[in-house]
């Protein structure tokens, strides 16, 4: 394949990844008339602008020249990642996205290796994310109406329920990973830290994710399961109501932050602005013992009921 490096960091090779992803070959529009072809190349895209970046990746808004659809093109410098685990996470992200098919989850479209980079083609959600909406309301010194909170939260719960039903845990649910389309549809993205669990085990021990949203069992690497996503959902629901994380204030002091998380020490939500049901659900999700947190089916059911109730009042 053109552009492959002559030597590789320990733990991976282009040939190994090409075996995982499949060989690149010219697109065949007749084979997939309504979608991107199975293997694209950079020549099939007109890149417009950079819209995001990570430690080893950059995300661009691009147009697919095959069908003129606007997409997100994530370019990952996979061969510059010195640690094999980071490379495995990128391949894992592709595997997770392939399994998931839900209107509230960013859709995987294609992937290919070119110019020593792994290119992942994703559905574009171009109207911003939940963190931007929270910042906007905070700047305006306004609270988000409860009906709006449930409108978005119920969609997020639907996405997480789909993931959990496929034995996939997100592991980094936070406002910045909850994208919103121009028509108000939630799209949960950034599955790079997600972990696929077999039916035999639901425990993992690696410390990943965003500290403000990490549950006590995750911080201490004592083993955790899908209930850690429930903790993060509770933190996100709280932040939509309070306009800040429940454990905000100790970003520069990890020890103090961990203490707050262990003790579930966070300010109460204003009872005069939000329903008892919302505050109750937050406290159920942000609970120190994962065995006593509700599952995603329960959280989603409450969200659906509250969405219907607040929409009709």
From Swiss-Prot:
ATP binds at residues 51-59, 74. It comes from the Eukaryota. It catalyses: L-seryl-[protein] + ATP = O-phospho-L-seryl-[protein] + ADP + H(+); L-threonyl-[protein] + ATP = O-phospho-L-threonyl-[protein] + ADP + H(+). Keywords: Apoptosis, ATP-binding, Cell cycle, Cell division, Chromosome partition, Cytoplasm, Cytoskeleton, Kinase, Magnesium, Metal-binding, Mitosis, Nucleotide-binding, Nucleus, Phosphoprotein, Serine/threonine-protein kinase, Transferase. It is found in: Cytoplasm; Nucleus; Nucleus speckle; Cytoplasm, Cytoskeleton, Microtubule organizing center, Centrosome. Signal peptide: none annotated. Its EC number is 2.7.11.34. This is Serine/threonine-protein kinase Nek6. It comes from Rattus norvegicus (Rat). The gene is Nek6.
